Amino acid sequence: MNDGFADDELSLPKATVQKMVSDILPVDLTFTKEARDLLIECCVEFIHLVSSEANEICEKEAKKTIAAEHIIKALENLEFKEYIAEALEVAAEHKEQQKNREKKSSKFEQSGVSRDELLRQQEELLSRARERFKNQNIAHDNHTTTAIPVPTASETETKEN
């Protein structure tokens, strides 16, 4: 599992860990930076251990992606059974969030306007742009100016097909 990072580069955000610990500890207790760093080191090792076990399970099943079931089985194999219930709960919440997530629609689908109407509007805009361009050419110089032809939407569509 070498993705360009050395093991000593793997870590957790120190400020986030500090805040989590501070929220849990009673107000009269303090948490030193050294203790925080040791906790982070232990957490990273735990994550590495579980993910390595889950990866082995995944490979034995000839799967390419580690799924929640692989993590649950890894927790069982490593005898971290006390984490399984919460892991299942989080996995179920995640699955529900994914189901409820609104699928992003394209601008075309959201517009409520048919393809033909959009093409008509585009043609109209191009026509107006051509008129403005012609008028600018006439107004700015009445001597030798060559207008550049702008293809219509139907001409462009015909060339693409």
Curated annotation (Swiss-Prot):
GO molecular function: protein heterodimerization activity; RNA polymerase II general transcription initiation factor activity; TBP-class protein binding
Subcellular location: Cytoplasm; Nucleus
BP-aspect Gene Ontology terms: negative regulation of transcription by RNA polymerase II; RNA polymerase II preinitiation complex assembly
GO cellular component: cytosol; negative cofactor 2 complex; nucleus
Residue segments, region Disordered: 93-116, 130-161
UniProt KW Mitochondrion keyword: no
Swiss-Prot/TrEMBL keywords: Cytoplasm, Nucleus
Comp. bias regions, Basic and acidic residues: 93-107
Residue intervals of the Histone-fold domain: 11-75
Cross-referenced InterPro entries: CBFA_NFYB_domain (IPR003958), Histone-fold (IPR009072), Ncb2 (IPR042225)
Ranges annotated as biased composition (Polar residues): 135-147
SUPFAM superfamilies given in the database record: Histone-fold (SSF47113)
Similarity-based family: Belongs to the NC2 beta/DR1 family.
Protein name: Negative cofactor 2 complex subunit beta
Annotated organism of origin: Schizosaccharomyces pombe (strain 972 / ATCC 24843) (Fission yeast)
